[in-house]
Amino acid sequence: MMKCIIIDDEPLALELLEDFVSKIPNLKLVSCCSNAIEAVSILQNNKIDLIFLDIEMPEFTGIEFIKSLDVKPLFIFTTAYSHYAIEGFNLNAVDYLVKPIPFHRFLKAVNRAQDLFVKKRRKLIIYQNFKFPKFYFC
């Protein structure tokens, strides 16, 4: 199960994304935030695996927000502006959804995030179970 948050300053977009998330069994919505500043405390107090993130928001854009994070969860940009797509992918966005977002496109993005999430967890498990050789120095 992936824990996610939604960050968007548009109430209708928040509502739609919340509805979409509720339809996907392997997603657990931790919080909806109307701006990126609200999300900072959510990220500090919770293990978040995926962020649905608007770009154009007052005070702090989604791009500025992602750049400010030391540890970046997987993230999917959700925006009305297609001209940020290249920058989004340069920041390693899982996907870039242009509003209005059809459910089938949302689902495709979530499946892509789920695949990356599973691969990341497998690598972590392999690393944790790896028996490092002991070196003895004289």
Language-model-derived ranges and their functions:
Residues 10-31:
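Two-component/phosphorelay signaling modules centered on CheY-like receiver
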Residues 6-7, 27, 36:
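Compact recognition or signaling/catalytic modules
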Residues 129-138:
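C-terminal output/effector regions of signal-responsive regulators
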Residues 1-4:
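Extreme N-terminal starter segment of soluble prokaryotic enzymes
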Residues 7-8, 33, 51:
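Conserved sequence signature across two-component system core domains
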Residues 12, 37-126:
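CheY-like receiver
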